[in-house]
Amino acid sequence: MGASLKKIEKSVATLELTIPKEKFEEGLDYAFKKNASKFNVPGFRKGKAPRFLVERYYGEGVLYEDAIEYVFHEAYQEALKTFNLEPVDYPDINILQIGKGKDLVLEATVAVMPEVELGEYKGIEIEKIEYDVYDGDVEYELEKLRQQNARIIPVEGRPAEQGDIAVIDFEGYIDDKPFEGGKGENYELELGSNTFVPGFEDQIISHNVGETFDVTVTFPEDYRVEELKGKTAVFKVTLKALNKKELPELDDEFAKDVSEFETLEELKQDIRKKLEEKNKREAENEMKEKAVMKVVENAKVDIPDVMVERQIDLSLRDLDYNLRLQGLDLNTYLSITGKTIQDLRKEMWEGALNRVKTQLVIDKIAKVENIEATEEELENKLKELAESYRVNLEEFKKSLTESQINGIKEDIAYYKTIDFIFNQCKIVSKEE
């Protein structure tokens, strides 16, 4: 069998495959045996007519499709190996020559893994990013701790006020008709939290426990549910109970209760230290992201559309999964947003293209620099994953396929390569 690479243009390869007539004859014989029981030739019981009569009665081409399928795979795989091509899609096949007693000549056009031409990726200059920790940041974290450790106590002898936690039953009506999602029972609503539609919480203030009253609101024009945008609704609300938070004093006793520290000052110092570490990580991640963006911009690569389309498919699958966690699905989301699946794919195109290019460039650098996951790194990652899933390490290992383990190795190498790029960067201060 012979093959020639006619051209590669924008990561799409065109191969010409020549299958010797003897091999094609073998394919025709295979196709006849496979389909013999389907042929009904006059003068013969169904499936009993010889091949030459079947071809005469139905036409020679009746066996071509299965014969081509029989011979194509071997010839195609040989050609890919010969020209060192890695396909990223199924090939389109065009018949250039076919017939009994002739070599079969096929043209296969397929998108292949693109060549990456790296630009500068060592010594990239990036601006230093730093985030300071202010006293207000520490106070904010302390206030969160107070809120988390607040006691909830009942309110008696007064109407609802801002900051109270109202326990309510409610049902909403538009044009005197109830609507989906407009009903709730024993719902705990913190007044002033802006959890509900604007104006709803304000109209509970000044009411007493046991009262039933109307709350009238207008849904914003940008409300997430299409059917409710701009609509006026009347809610029948019953205030069943009223509670409030009793916040602990910020003192040494509070520090002892919520931490391992003896004094409030020690707790503050610990909060500051953790915030500084968090800010340092975030700043470093931002600098890494900027470095990778520059490296990707410096590289040249022709990405076949099919790779972008597949990335979009993955993004849509992730979106649908996340929507289902919220009780929705992709079709409902499209209905709410007034978009079509084509609109969504178009919006996702640029982001998907950038993700594919980034992956290709990082993979190329990893290959050039011989960056791989070590056995120790793999073992540590498997331990980390097993702990996160709360399963036994050995059982977790046994549950993984070879493909999944290779995927974990690739992830490790990917992030090691990003660290490599970052460690090679020249970090300059804004003043410079």
Curated annotation (Swiss-Prot):
Protein name: Trigger factor
Coiled coil regions in record: none
GO biological process, one term: chaperone-mediated protein folding
Subcellular location per the Swiss-Prot or TrEMBL entry: Cytoplasm
Name of the coding gene: tig
Catalytic activity entry: [protein]-peptidylproline (omega=180) = [protein]-peptidylproline (omega=0)
Keyword Transmembrane helix: no
One Gene Ontology term of the molecular function aspect: ribosome binding
